[in-house]
């Protein structure tokens, strides 16, 4: 039977009705999750069709086992994203015969034994690419690569160390397209490795390792040495009793560098590796192939080589009865019932994944390539199949933690809210483990279950203390899944649940968004024009559950409130002082550590800090994370990579008074006299049909001045396309007039000079260029300069086109990973735009926009 197809507009309108007018959620669903073929045909009209597809497939697996759950009941759990939300890969892939891809969200690869040869490294590189083309994020550990300068028996004579291979793996990630986005990669290394300092510094060089997240695996011994000021011993191999290389380092100095780099650029992340291994249930089976070596790209699933995980989130907000009222209460009975079903559904999805692996292997077999070419990919999926079926690992998580707490009248970051969040997570953990034990009775335990191996595991001991009867049942019957739980960032799925994401607080209860408009329509207001000439109107957006709070408290949601009114509303709401940038930072870290006790995998969470915090605060947060039992910690200091949503509220100064005293901010360093010669980058760009070139003068590697003009025309600037760097030379005449020349070396080393850059400018642009160079000279933060350029209100269409080119040229110098303040992704609407090589990339949906 030929399947019915829908036009984009049909699907969008049906989804718009489904989401009750939420245009952003509707577009996200149609663009990312509706079933499509490679020709763009859409086979689902609304999320109801998708949920029916998922329910039918999961029920098909249920029918293989005793006491099957019906498709109708499963659909009821999924419908309107109310209770259970599979992550993107399962949601897209289950029952989808239009693509051959894995249902797994994340993988870790690696080689057991010696893995420091070129052959082993190239093999991991190929495996990484093969997984990413099937939609998976990948992590792998570099601790087995020998340190720089080690003797090798090849023509090089000594090893190059870790960093060149970081760049190789990063570049491979950037080459792979997954639904129009790049792959996700995590690279980790042990702090014991002699090259760990080079690893920690690798991303501090602009443009390096831009395709990977990097995290350093820190052991308890290092932390104690760093805190107590004692030396620490590094060695290679890191676990060898008789290492080939040893050196003693200043642990405090290396720790200070980790803190500084995290403060400056949000990387590296830290993984408290002894905590991870000590708490890991799969590591009870390390000698059977379940030794944890790295994590997935977001850090919430530590994994052994060739294992994978599929994720699912439970919407906590939906279990609050009478939300935002004095009668609000959490329905623990319904929650336990649904957690048990969620764990069961996750186990069913493992069977569906094994079916997908069958299809992948058949596809590989049928490919026309030579058998030798196909061998690595085929064997890769064989290893993944083996680990998947052997451990049956699941990732049951949560979302809407922030909204749940607000709906109950609890302020995120307080001790009361933390205690309740721990109670909810403990309830979830016990219910999920009880469900896994019940499935072991009905379906059989995972193949290598051994109660004796697990009896001293701290997580299992907590289960035993909390529910002795469950523990005894588990010892008798086993458990269906080697590990069950996680808390992941829920990304775009939180747009469809219309809640806060994962364990995070609300980002902003009120913010600005842009809507494309017809600039010729007299009824609209144009606030922004992008590089293509599209016009946008800015408007105020309320977080969905903030609107629910307003309605529950009899506040008119249709009124056009002033900024002062909005500020008063937020201040009187349960979201006051509970946003991502407002929460008590130490309490957030302690909350993560407390909840971690009831999560057998890990938690992905970010501590958002204002720009003016000191490195000492970052140090205290990291140390507190280690002491609190966190398995990892990520710090993001506002502006360290620049860019987030624009808050509508008036700025309130927040200090570190509760933690440490903040030193006065030093004024920017300004060079009063321009050097006669500045290094210069040449940046080419195209606006409409015109080719432009920008000469960006650099002082200390930072833009100091800019000249732009047309190239390749009679009056323009003619340069070989190979020229990307040079010097801007300033000449001052006897009459005080100034001239700026561009000088470069050709391939043969001869200098060529292009005289009179200022004369190459159209006079129409000259004053604007002087303005921009002026603010660059006086060290305005670069992202603010770009905002200033973008905000220029210019009547001439030509100048508007030119200013976009200037923005594009300057964006090149914003550090990769810098968040884009005040901008939302035009595709998914999330506040997750970051700068990457001068382009804006959405971390959630992968949409990119350059210019």
Outline where the language-model segments fall.
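Catalytic alpha/beta core of large soluble enzyme barrels
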Residues: 23, 27, 299-301, 353, ...
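Short, cysteine/histidine-rich loop/knuckle motifs that typically chelate Zn2+
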Residues: 826-830, 844
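Cysteine-rich micro-motifs
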Residues: 838-848
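Terminal amphipathic helices with adjacent charged low-complexity linkers/tails
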Residues: 218, 279, 284-286, 296, ...
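Short, Gly/Pro- and small/polar-rich lid/capping loops
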Residues: 471-473, 648-698
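Function-dense linear segments that define catalytic or interfacial modules
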Residues: 35, 57-63, 77-154, 162-165, ...
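Conserved, charged catalytic cores of large soluble enzymes
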Residues: 2-68, 154-168, 178-290, 321-326, ...
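Internal maturation/activation junctions in enzymes
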Residues: 74-75, 235-239, 338-385, 389, ...
């Amino acid at each position: 039977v030929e399947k019915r197809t829908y036009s984009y507009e049909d699907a969008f309108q049906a989804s718009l009705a489904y989401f009750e007018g939420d245009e952003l959620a509707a577009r996200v669903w149609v663009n990312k999750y509706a079933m499509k073929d490679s020709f763009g045909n859409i086979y689902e009209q609304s999320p109801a069709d998708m949920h029916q597809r998922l329910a039918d497939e999961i029920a098909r697996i249920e029918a293989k086992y005793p006491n099957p759950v019906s498709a109708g009941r499963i659909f009821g759990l999924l419908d309107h994203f109310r209770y259970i939300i599979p992550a993107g890969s399962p949601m897209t892939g289950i029952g989808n015969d239009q693509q051959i891809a894995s249902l797994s969200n994340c993988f870790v690869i690696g080689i057991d034994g010696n893995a420091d040869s070129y052959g082993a490294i190239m093999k991991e590189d190929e495996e990484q690419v093969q997984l990413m083309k099937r939609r998976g994020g990948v992590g792998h550990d570099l601790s087995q690569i020998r340190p720089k300068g080690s003797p090798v028996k090849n023509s090089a004579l000594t090893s190059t160390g870790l960093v060149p291979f970081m760049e190789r793996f990063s570049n491979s990630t950037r080459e792979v397209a997954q639904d129009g986005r790049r792959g996700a990669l995590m690279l980790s290394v042990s702090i014991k490795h002699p090259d760990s300092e080079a690893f920690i510094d690798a991303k501090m060089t602009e443009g390096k390792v831009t395709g990977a997240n990097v995290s350093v695996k820190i052991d308890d011994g290092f932390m104690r040495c760093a805190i107590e000021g004692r030396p620490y011993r590094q060695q290679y191999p890191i676990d060898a009793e008789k290492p080939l290389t040893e050196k003693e380092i200043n642990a405090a100095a290396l720790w200070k560098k980790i803190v500084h780099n995290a403060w400056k650029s949000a990387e590296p992340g830290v993984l408290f590796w002894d905590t991870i291994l000590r708490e890991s249930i799969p590591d009870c089976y390390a000698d059977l192939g379940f030794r944890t070596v790295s994590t997935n790209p977001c850090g919430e699933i530590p994994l052994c080589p060739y294992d994978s995980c599929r994720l699912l989130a439970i919407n906590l907000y939906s279990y609050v009865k009478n939300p935002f009222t004095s009668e609000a209460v959490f329905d623990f009975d319904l929650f336990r019932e649904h957690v048990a079903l969620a764990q069961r559904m996750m186990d069913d999805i493992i069977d569906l994944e094994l079916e997908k692996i069958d299809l992948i292997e058949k596809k590989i077999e049928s490919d026309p390539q030579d058998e030798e070419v196909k061998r690595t990919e085929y064997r890769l999926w064989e290893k993944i199949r083996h680990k998947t079926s052997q451990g049956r690992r699941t990732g049951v998580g949560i979302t809407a933690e922030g909204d749940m707490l607000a709906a109950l009248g609890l302020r995120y970051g307080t001790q009361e809210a933390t205690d309740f969040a721990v109670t909810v997570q403990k309830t979830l953990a016990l219910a999920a483990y009880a469900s896994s034990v019940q499935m072991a009775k009905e379906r059989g335990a995972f193949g290598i279950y051994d109660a004796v191996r697990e009896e001293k595991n701290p997580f299992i001991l907590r289960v035993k203390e909390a529910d002795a009867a469950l523990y005894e049942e588990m010892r008798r019957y086993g458990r269906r899944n080697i590990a069950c739980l996680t808390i992941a960032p829920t990304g775009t799925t939180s747009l469809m649940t219309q809640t806060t994401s994962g364990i995070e607080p609300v980002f902003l209860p009120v913010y600005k968004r842009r809507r494309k408009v017809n600039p010729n329509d007299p009824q609209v207001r144009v606030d922004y024009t992008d590089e293509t000439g599209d016009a946008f109107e800015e408007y105020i957006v309320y977080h969905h559950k903030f609107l629910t709070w307003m309605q529950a408290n009899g506040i008119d949601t249709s009124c056009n409130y002033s900024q002062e009114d909005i500020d008063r509303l937020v201040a009187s709401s349960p979201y006051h002082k509970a946003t991502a940038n407002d929460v008590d930072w130490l309490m957030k870290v302690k909350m993560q550590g407390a909840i971690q006790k009831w999560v057998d995998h890990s938690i992905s969470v970010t501590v958002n800090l204002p720009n003016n915090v000191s490195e000492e605060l970052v140090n205290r947060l990291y140390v507190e994370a280690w002491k609190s039992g966190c398995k990892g910690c990520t710090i993001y200091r506002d502006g360290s990579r620049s860019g987030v949503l624009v808050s509508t509220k008036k700025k309130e100064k927040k200090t570190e008074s509760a933690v440490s005293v903040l030193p006065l901010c030093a004024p920017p360093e300004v060079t009063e006299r321009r050097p006669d010669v500045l290094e210069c980058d040449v940046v080419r760009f195209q606006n409409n049909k015109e080719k432009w070139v920008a000469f960006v003068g650099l002082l200390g590697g930072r833009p100091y001045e800019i000249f732009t003009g047309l190239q390749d025309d009679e009056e323009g600037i003619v340069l070989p396309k190979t020229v990307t760097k040079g010097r801007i030379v300033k000449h001052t005449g006897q009459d005080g007039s100034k001239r700026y020349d561009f000088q470069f070396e050709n391939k043969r080393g001869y200098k060529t000079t292009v005289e009179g850059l200022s004369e190459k400018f159209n006079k129409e642009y000259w004053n604007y260029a002087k303005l921009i160079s002026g603010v660059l000279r006086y060290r305005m933060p670069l992202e603010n300069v770009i905002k200033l350029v973008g905000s220029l209100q210019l009547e001439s269409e030509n100048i508007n086109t030119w200013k976009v080119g200037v923005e594009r040229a300057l964006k090149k110098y914003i550090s990769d990973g810098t968040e884009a303040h005040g901008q939302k992704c035009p595709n998914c609407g999330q506040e997750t735009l970051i700068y990457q090589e001068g382009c804006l990339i959405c971390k959630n949906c992968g949409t990119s926009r350059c210019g």
